[in-house]
Amino acid sequence: NYGTYVGKMDILSSLSTLSFDKRRSKFFTDELLILLKLIDTNQIDYKTLYGSWAGAFGFFQFMPSTMKNYAIDFDKNSYIDLKNNNDAYASASNYLNQIGWNSANPCFFRISYNNWQVVDLPLVPVIPIVIGLI
């Protein structure tokens, strides 16, 4: 059911509320400010900003900082719309390209469990990725 449900929360309200949470106030405040800047510069349409409770938006659930750094207005309609296939896929492709993903590397591994037992495997990422505020 890809794309049929991308969240129903107003992400402006979500980020505003979460910016007051002491545990991650700086992160969510920064995300809120980035979102407001994207709206102010007419890069995104504020009327379409419904997503997750944490402020993620679109088919690929981009946070505002990810939108700012990687989202593309592929269909050239003057707005980045991550609920539009053209913009969403172009943005996801740009994101993967910019973080160094190589199409020659596998994106998943086939695994199996004997008798449904949890197995502790020493898995390491194929591509080391630094996770943090983008």
Locate each region found by the language model.
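Catalytic glycan-binding domains that act on GlcNAc-containing polysaccharides
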Residues: 1-134
